[in-house]
Design a protein with these regions (language model features):
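Helix-rich interaction surfaces within compact, conserved domain-sized segments
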Residues: 100, 104-107
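N-terminal intrinsically disordered, cationic/polar leader segments
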Residues: 1-97, 113-130
C-alpha cells in the first residue's frame, strides 16, 4: 500500500507528577479516524486516494506520574477509495504505530528530565478486539 504521510502533530501532551490520592484514572489509549474532505474542492488530490486524519488520544496514570494528550497525523492512502474500517488490522497497526512511538519517545524524554534518571519506557500492546 502506497501511503503519503504528513508530519506527526502533538496537539496536546500533559505531564503531571502531582496526582490527587484516591482519584481513579482509567488508563486508555484510543484510535480515532476521520475522513478528510478537500479544501477548495481539490478534486485532483482526492482522485489519488482517500485522506484520513488519525488521532491517538491517551490518558495513562503510572506510579509516579500521569500523562494525557492527543497526537495526530494526516495520511493519504494512494489508490484506496474504501472506508478506513475496510483495512486489515495489520495495516491499521502500521499506520498508528508511528504515533504510539511518538508518545513513547516524548514520555521517555520528559521523565528522564523530570526525574533526573533514565526515562520511563512505555510498552503498549495492540488490542484488536475493537
Amino acid at each position: 500500500m502506497d501511503i503519503v504521510t504528513n508530519k506527526i502533530v502533538v496537539e496536546k501532551y500533559n505531564f503531571e507528577t502531582t496526582m490527587e490520592e484516591n482519584q481513579p484514572f482509567e488508563n486508555k489509549i484510543e484510535l480515532e479516524v476521520h475522513e478528510v474532505e478537500p479544501v477548495d474542492g481539490n478534486v485532483e488530490l482526492m482522485a489519488k486516494g482517500k485522506i484520513f486524519k488519525i488521532t491517538i488520544p491517551f490518558l495513562l496514570a503510572l506510579e509516579n506520574f500521569r500523562i494525557d494528550g492527543r497526537i495526530s497525523r494526516i495520511i493519504q492512502l494512494k489508490d484506496f477509495f474504501g472506508q478506513f474500517s475496510d483495512l486489515e488490522a495489520a495495516d491499521v497497526e502500521a499506520l498508528s504505530n508511528p504515533l504510539i512511538d511518538y508518545i513513547k519517545r516524548i514520555t521517555y524524554d520528559v521523565t528522564e528530565i523530570a526525574f533526573d534518571e533514565p526515562g520511563v519506557s512505555l510498552d503498549f500492546n495492540a488490542n484488536h478486539d475493537g
